[in-house]
């Protein structure tokens, strides 16, 4: 926006001034609409960043390296969730590996999380689930993730957040924030969801909204969430998708006054992602992440 504003003030405005001085009204009037549109695009269309009260970059991951994900920023959730929550609580079909470049790596400036059709530890698929827990934990702020997600029936990619210390109890009492979820049988659709004790998927009261977004598996999009003490806002490419307000009734509805951390994963199958089965012909499938930025 800085370059665009300099273009307006130093180049475009003087040219327009001279044009209006030399032109009659018949020439000027048909030009007004086009000029207004140009001004809107260049100068009057604020980004999420310019609207936000959070301006200070406090954490970022640009993936400007090669190999395994940076261990100072990322840990792995491992296996199939057993013995605590086998299938990760959703009857998912993948085995999450760690320190294995076939499933999680950085290359060409992107994080790659790859789901593969292969047997491991009694499961028929492998993938990865990365988390910033105890390496990046935040209360309030704006998080933005530029990503391109996989396609195919049975895929279940997610960009989401969980509480770091579970101070209000186990799921869903301490909350869950889903910045972006997609299931492969709903191509070109993404959802943003909040789970709490009062509002959650187990009792079908979760606060969720979606948007039809063509090209989610062929182009990068920016998935964002802004979190204050009073409200959460969810965006795709700067356009609001969902919001959730603190109704001040207590932690059953709003447990979001504690630190949360970020998770990135590609699940396979499960209660929701596998509702219509898994198409084995689509493997391997990848989620690519270009960058992640957290402002407070």
Predicted features by range, described:
Residues 1-52:
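Bacterial Sec-dependent N-terminal signal peptides
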Residues 46-296:
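GH16 jelly-roll
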